[in-house]
Amino acid sequence: MIRTLEDSLRLVEGAGASNGGICFDTWHIVKLKIPYAELRRIPAQYITSVELNDGMFECPWSLHEDTVNHRRLCGEGEFDLKGFIVAMQAAGHRGPWGIEVLSEELRK
């Protein structure tokens, strides 16, 4: 499992594929406790897309349960989405942005 930005960058750089890159997802960045300041250092050519979602910092269920059933719509959780967006823009991202909310409640 890739747990650091450095590991992600090494993988992408090592692959040497012109169409390779990293999709940055707020949920993963927050759960891995990666400071937004670190995102500003990512070379823009490696940022392929960004996915926004919200959630809680701490939860009573398993990480897997949190991953697939308890993400929230933007603005309905505790994540600093504005800070994340500012950091990605500061890194030079000008590509696609999406919303990814895996939620048992929204699937009903």
Q: Language-model segments: which ranges?
A:
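Histidine-acidic metal/acid-base catalytic patches
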Residues: 2-24, 30-108
